[in-house]
Every structure is written in structure tokens, then in C-alpha cells.
Design a protein with these regions (language model features):
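Gly/Ser/Thr-rich active-site loops/lids in small-molecule metabolic enzymes
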Residues: 212-225
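Conserved alpha/beta cores of soluble small-molecule-handling proteins
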Residues: 1-195, 201-204, 222-297
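Short, intrinsically disordered, charge-balanced linker/junction segments flanking boundaries
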Residues: 204-211
Length: 297
């Protein structure tokens, strides 16, 4: 799950001395310039706004290092190629822009939203009218779920909104068009559940509200499972499989790794985060602190 439901700006110190630092307005990267957040604007004719025509990546950074940056950029470039979007920056320029955005905001731990829109065009749908894509980079802190939710687990509810099929929009593209996910989120809110469980047209579980692509956090969970000697099987699953599971967890860049303890009102396992989930979470947090692209070097 890559989509933050709640974003906060932390008043915790960004330096290592422990001294308090006042919360200050964000500095945003917009098309090669760093501007105060109140001046970070896009045109009303940008096709990212008009049609959701664009792509994005959500990227975490921990302890002064950007986590799996190269993998996120690989996915960004793949998404761009898939939708015939010519990125206006080189790989090295994009990397430096991400790092400098974090530096401008004096952060060591947080979340990056890297956005590329089709750019300014007219009110027509034709993307050839957009002469140059727009790049926006936001660095901030994030709290998708509370500490208590990570300790106690989430509740999920199956929603009526079906996940958009790959024949309509390939899930490998991390598109700006998230209305399908938003509608599922609304259903979860109305049901007073923490997350929505989405099904595909065959009735198999597709995802929750924020992830349906080659998940980078998901791949790390697979790596951890291999370390722990846990067999991974990738198969289609239904609600039945969730109901009878001993443990269940969700993964995503913003959410990281978090247990699920109840689905559609039915308790999963003991109703508490299980031992495998807890080991996964602990190891994931270790890995995020072990490496990454240095921000301040």
C-alpha cells in the first residue's frame, strides 16, 4: 500500500543532537525549481489534473538514506515507457533532485512523493498537445497508521468496488488515476474499517486500496521470508483463505508491513498479530536502517 491517508509534519528534531526544531513550511521541487509549498502550483490545464494522466512513486527514507531508490526509479521509468511519457530528466538528475528535496527540508526520516504529469495541454484528451511533462517532488513526514495499529493490527472489509482489471489499466503502471482506490476507501470509511479489501472480476483478492503492482515492500517481505525459512507460494486467494488464515499482513511503501487481525468482522487467527508477522515487521525495520542511498554525504 503506497497511499498515505494521513500526513503529518513532525516537530521532532531532524538532526542527531536531539535539539528541538520548529516545524517549517515545506520546500517543493517543481520543474527544476525549489519553491515554498504555498507557491508550489500546477496549471489548471495540466493533464495530470484534468485526466489523472501521469505517474508517481512513493519512496521512503530512513536515518538519512533513501530506501531502495534505484528500484523505485526503475519502476518510474518502466511506467513512463508504458504510457509513452518521455521523462524530462535523466536518471542522475532525477536522483539528485530527490536527494536535494530532502536536504532542502532538513529531514532524515520520511516519505517522498515523486510525480510526473503529462504536462500542460488543452481541454482535449490527446496527449500530443502536452509539450513537456511536469516533475514534482515532495519530501515530508508521514503517519499512515498509528503506533497502536502496528501493535494491535488492522481490520479490513471486503468492498463492492472491484479492482480495475489489467485489460483496462495495467497494474504495473503506477498511475495518478486512483479513483478506483478512492471509491474503495470510501466504502471502508463507511464500514468503519481500517482498510478495504478489493476483489478482481473473478472474486479473488486483488489488493487493498493502495497497491496493485510490482510491490517493492512486498519483494522485501519475500526476502525476509526466505531468511526465516518460510515458504512463499504465489497463488490466487479468495475471502475464504483470509477467513481461515492463521495470520495475515499487508505491505506497501507508506504502510510498510502491518498485521491484519479481522476481516469482514471475522477474527483472523487469535485476533492478535501472530509470531510470523511480528518477526517480519521487526526484520523489515532492521533492513530499512541497514542501507540505502545516502542523502547527506
Amino acid at each position: 500500500m503506497e497511499e498515505p491517508r494521513k500526513t503529518t509534519r513532525s516537530a521532532k528534531p531532524a538532526n542527531e543532537s536531539g535539539s528541538a526544531k520548529a516545524v517549517k513550511p515545506l520546500t517543493i521541487f517543481v520543474d527544476g525549481e525549489f519553491v515554498p509549498e504555498e507557491d508550489a502550483k500546477v496549471s489548471v490545464f495540466d493533464h495530470g489534473l484534468l485526466y489523472g494522466d501521469g505517474i508517481f512513486e512513493g519512496i521512503r527514507f530512513y536515518n538519512g538514506r533513501v530506501f531502495r531508490l534505484e528500484e523505485h526509479l526503475d519502476r518510474l521509468w518502466d511506467s513512463a515507457r508504458s504510457i509513452c511519457l518521455d521523462l524530462p530528466m535523466s536518471r542522475s538528475e532525477m536522483t539528485e533532485a530527490v536527494l536535494e528535496t530532502i536536504r532542502k527540508n532538513d529531514l532524515r526520516d520520511g516519505y517522498i512523493r515523486l510525480i510526473v504529469t503529462r504536462g500542460v495541454g488543452n481541454l482535449g484528451l490527446n496527449p500530443t498537445q502536452c509539450k513537456r511533462p511536469s516533475v514534482i517532488i515532495i519530501a515530508t513526514t508521514i503517519a499512515l497508521y498509528s503506533k497502536e495499529m502496528y501493535q494491535n493490527g488492522l481490520t479490513v472489509v471486503t468492498v463492492a468496488t472491484r479492482r480495475t482489471g489489467p485489460g483496462a489499466l495495467n497494474p504495473a503502471v503506477k498511475s495518478l488515476n486512483y479513483l478506483n482506490n478512492v471509491m474503495a476507501r470510501i466504502e471502508a470509511n463507511l464500514a468503519e474499517a481500517d482498510e478495504a479489501l478489493m476483489l478482481n472480476d473473478q472474486g479473488c483478492i486483488a489488493e487493498c486500496t493502495a497497491e496493485a503492482l510490482r510491490g517493492i515492500t512486498r519483494s522485501i517481505v519475500f526476502e525476509i521470508a526466505a531468511e526465516l525459512g518460510i515458504k512463499i507460494s504465489e497463488v490466487d486467494i479468495s475471502r475464504h483463505d483470509v477467513f481461515i488464515a492463521d495470520e495475515c499482513l499487508l505491505s506497501g511503501t507508506a504502510a510498510e508491513v502491518i498485521p491484519v487481525v479481522k476481516a469482514d468482522g471475522r477474527v483472523i487467527g487469535t485476533g492478535k498479530p501472530g509470531p510470523i508477522s511480528l518477526r517480519m515487521i521487526a526484520r523489515f525495520r532492521e533492513i530499512t536502517r541497514e542501507g540505502g542511498t545516502p542523502i547527506y554525504s
